[in-house]
């Protein structure tokens, strides 16, 4: 498998090894992946939603209405022309496009990341404007909790995130899980004692199955 680009165009392709089409040149995997990334960014930027649906989503996700959102733009540290353009589009647009810069500005204030906005416009699901908190209470108390590669017992992540956790402790069997989180979760994780390497205790005067000898201790 090789990666190829058509000369004079922005067309990229994946071709079988040794079968480069006429008019194409071979490119690196990194260049091909960058092309895919840019195409996805272009697609996301063109996503749109009806203004009423966006305002409704903000109410459901953040309990913030249109007047509050407009006030945030008015109070933003922008030059007069940029602020006027933002407010004009905010007031007059029939549809809102993901590429509208005011969304990233508002998102930063409201704790909504660019990735969360991308997912919201892509799915039209207001839940993707929210976050979920995962708390893990481990037993025994000295167990180590690792969530998404960090030693913590509590994290807050965007709705729909995939989280993984490990709970471990000397002398106990570790527990691991990975799942998609869509609501606040509190997990009670109780570790079982690790008996796999524990030497068996043989009572006095009991014949062992392995040797047939009597234990006299």
Descriptions of predicted regions:
Residues 5-6, 15-136, 173, 180-217:
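Viral virion structural and adsorption modules
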Residues 1, 133, 142-144, 162-164:
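Exposed beta-strand and adjacent loop surfaces of beta-rich binding modules
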Residues 137-143, 160, 172:
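Short proline/glycine-enriched turn/loop motifs at strand-loop junctions of beta-rich domains
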Residues 130, 140-150:
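Short, ordered, surface-exposed loop/turn motifs in non-cytosolic proteins
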Residues 167-177:
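A short, solvent-exposed loop/turn motif at the edges and junctions
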Residues 161-165, 185-187:
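Exposed beta-strand face motif in extracellular beta-rich ectodomains
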Residues 147-159, 176-177, 181-183:
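Short, solvent-exposed S/T- and G/P-enriched segments that are highly enriched in secreted/extracellular
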